[in-house]
């Protein structure tokens, strides 16, 4: 089963992924972008080079295609539980050029069975971002991240409606422990 955690930077995805590693020791943990060696190189170029937004979108789509082919599909074939920090949902939400059609091509229509969506309000996001050094995306401001968060939600529910992906929407301001228990229960009900 393929499970993804989605949310803007600062929502707590990475914290939850680390906790899930202790809970689901036999699962394959991965991430997008950069879940393969080639993907790490593409991610580095996409995030650090001065390139057009269209070129950046295609680098991320290339990363997604490689990740699907070399990580996701083999693990699904082996009937493994796959837990990914981000997916095509982030790809579509963060890019102005990344369509569902292009992402379905890149993923060969391999979609997550379950989507965990961590949502955070403006105040919570401000507080969390103030505690860390900001990357290029985070430096675009709170309003930009809240706009991306709305797109994440829209894309997650569109996948639910069109393809039957299950969505668990959570308030990222809940305690780390409560979030972990809800996420683990959501994953377990199909494992």
Swiss-Prot record:
Any Gene Ontology CC annotation: cytoplasm
Keywords: ATP-binding, Kinase, Nucleotide biosynthesis, Nucleotide-binding, Transferase
Keyword Nucleotidyltransferase: no
Any one GO molecular function term: dTMP kinase activity
Catalysed reactions, semicolon-separated: dTMP + ATP = dTDP + ADP
Pfam families in the cross-refs: Thymidylate_kin
Binding site for ATP: 7-14
Biological processes per GO annotation: dTDP biosynthetic process; dTTP biosynthetic process; dUDP biosynthetic process
Similarity-based family: Belongs to the thymidylate kinase family.
HAMAP family cross-referenced by the UniProt entry: Thymidylate_kinase (MF_00165)
Function summary: Phosphorylation of dTMP to form dTDP in both de novo and salvage pathways of dTTP synthesis.
Name this protein carries in UniProt: Thymidylate kinase
Encoding gene, per UniProt annotation: tmk
């Amino acid at each position: 089963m393929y499970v993804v955690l989605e949310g803007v930077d600062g929502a707590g995805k990475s914290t939850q992924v680390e906790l899930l590693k202790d809970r689901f020791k036999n699962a394959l943990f991965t991430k997008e972008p950069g879940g393969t060696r080639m993907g790490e190189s593409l991610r580095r170029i996409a995030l650090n080079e001065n390139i057009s937004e269209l070129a950046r979108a295609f680098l991320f789509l290339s990363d997604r295609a490689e990740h699907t082919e070399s990580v996701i599909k083999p693990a699904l074939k082996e009937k493994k539980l796959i837990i990914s920090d981000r997916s095509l949902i982030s790809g579509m939400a963060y890019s102005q050029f990344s369509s569902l059609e292009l992402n379905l091509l890149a993923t060969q229509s391999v979609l997550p069975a379950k989507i965990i969506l961590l949502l955070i309000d403006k105040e919570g996001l401000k507080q969390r971002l103030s505690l860390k050094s900001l990357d290029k995306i985070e430096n675009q401001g709170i309003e930009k991240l809240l706009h991306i968060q709305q797109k994440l939600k829209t894309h997650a529910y569109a996948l639910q409606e069109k393809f039957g992906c299950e969505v668990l929407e959570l308030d990222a301001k809940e305690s780390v422990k409560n979030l972990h228990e809800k996420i683990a229960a959501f994953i377990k009900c199909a494992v």
